[in-house]
Amino acid sequence: MKALIQRVAKAQVTVAGEEVGAIGPGLLALVGIEPQDDRESIGRMLHRLLNYRVFADAEGRMNLSLAQLGGGLLLVSQFTLAADTRSGLRPSFSSAAPPAQGQALFEALLALARERHPQVAGGRFGAHMRVELVNDGPVTFLLEA
């Protein structure tokens, strides 16, 4: 499982003109599910998302986590993160989880996040989404679990 996280001032996701998720200050996580991922992967990734220290403390150092700040978490499924781009000029998606597995695991990640964190929003799996964000930094990291 991969998550491309971006520290944001705000972010929202819309599907067919309808807002399906939005947050204020926090993290936007674009999540790619791979075939070997399972429920344990979800727990590990959520722990990292909530506890990765990417927010500034009083001295301006990246020393605080989303859990410590209580900011928003916007989870958006993005199977293209699992693409194999090592060769050629076109990505291969054979390294991404099949849609049924990806949807089940993404929805489980979203449900677990909502149990463990007060401000969680999500995109719609498999939909063509428009994601808007105001980057804070910019601060972007690729997490793997």
From Swiss-Prot:
A motif (Gly-cisPro motif, important for rejection of L-amino acids) lies at residues 137-138. Its EC number is 3.1.1.96. It is found in: Cytoplasm. Gene3D superfamilies: D-tyrosyl-tRNA(Tyr) deacylase. One of its GO terms (biological process) is D-amino acid catabolic process. One of its GO terms (cellular component) is cytoplasm. GO terms for molecular function: D-tyrosyl-tRNA(Tyr) deacylase activity; Gly-tRNA(Ala) deacylase activity; Ser(Gly)-tRNA(Ala) hydrolase activity; tRNA binding. It catalyses: glycyl-tRNA(Ala) + H2O = tRNA(Ala) + glycine + H(+); a D-aminoacyl-tRNA + H2O = a tRNA + a D-alpha-amino acid + H(+). It is an enzyme of class 3 (hydrolase). A Gly-cisPro motif from one monomer fits into the active site of the other monomer to allow specific chiral rejection of L-amino acids. Homodimer. This is D-aminoacyl-tRNA deacylase.
